[in-house]
């Protein structure tokens, strides 16, 4: 029996990146032997064990053979005779098929992963890559993480991914797996690479049709030099990732904010009147299909509905600002206003030539919200107030606080 460090921990160390969890593969053992050493079995589909002291995962070396459709149709063999090289061959990409012998530091790299790391190439290991449709999403997610390091996908891997999309393999992916890969991509610095990769291999229209529909929809060049709404969406996603690193909640809201532009009549192009309202339905549809957490869906709907109002904040009357805060449930969920402000700033800056633009509307919205939030029912003289009068008086007091918070010379955002 011998164990090797494998996968992401080895890859990230070679890239000089912070390593995540350590995963180990065990050669020459069976489940009974692992249990006798105190390892706790946790794997449902294949033998995985937790180390009795460190809690790290140790998986028996295994092979996988396709016997059905989709990503679950595999026969697993974890016999003690399975070699390390056989286990590494079943993995997705060469850069993930590198093992390290921790006793002497030797790298075991039978499929050229070290060279691909040096060349910054994401390459599949074998034709078996095509047997698991989830790997198309994993490739896109890896690009969201690795594109900033200069990585690209090997041409032969792109070709295989296109074929997988064309033959319908991706239709077997369940919503939870799509959401898992999408949400993880939103934690990286270049989530647009996730969308771009899927679009390149014709997979975006299968797994995220609401987003795919944005591509090819023109915007007014005076306000959107990038013109294409899909490209605007990519820019917004990357700006959001910079403004709120690792924040999936803000990332998802930014992803959904302009879905309505795909539904505006062609006769109005490149203008998109009412796209905020039109975007509510596809945002809800996408959220429900992927079984997105409710708080994600709620913020996405708020961003979709309110982003133009925030852009033109300086033109809104005090009572209109108060109504905006109420629609956001901002007095019970105060964190939403800062989140909305970030999404709107990403929208404003997600345009060619505006990536570093100042966005005072966001700070001003937070300032107005803070002024209104500071007023509560205890501050009112309630001697002569009863029932609904208390709520009405509180609303008026908060509107006065908004009015007293000052104004600024901000943009209108009318043409967004």
Curated annotation (Swiss-Prot):
Disulfide bonds: none annotated. ATP binds at residues 8, 11, 91, 138, 141. Its EC number is 2.7.7.72, 3.1.3.-, 3.1.4.-. Magnesium is required for nucleotidyltransferase activity. Pfam families: PolyA_pol, PolyA_pol_RNAbd. GO terms for biological process: RNA repair; tRNA 3'-terminal CCA addition. It catalyses: a tRNA precursor + 2 CTP + ATP = a tRNA with a 3' CCA end + 3 diphosphate; a tRNA with a 3' CCA end + 2 CTP + ATP = a tRNA with a 3' CCACCA end + 3 diphosphate. CTP binds at residues 8, 11, 91, 138, 141. PANTHER family: MULTIFUNCTIONAL CCA PROTEIN. Monomer. Can also form homodimers and oligomers. A single active site specifically recognizes both ATP and CTP and is responsible for their addition. Catalyzes the addition and repair of the essential 3'-terminal CCA sequence in tRNAs without using a nucleic acid template. Adds these three nucleotides in the order of C, C, and A to the tRNA nucleotide-73, using CTP and ATP as substrates and producing inorganic pyrophosphate. tRNA 3'-terminal CCA addition is required both for tRNA processing and repair. Also involved in tRNA surveillance by mediating tandem CCA addition to generate a CCACCA at the 3' terminus of unstable tRNAs. While stable tRNAs receive only 3'-terminal CCA, unstable tRNAs are marked with CCACCA and rapidly degraded. This is Multifunctional CCA protein. It comes from Xylella fastidiosa (strain Temecula1 / ATCC 700964). The lineage of its organism: Bacteria, Pseudomonadati, Pseudomonadota, Gammaproteobacteria, Lysobacterales.
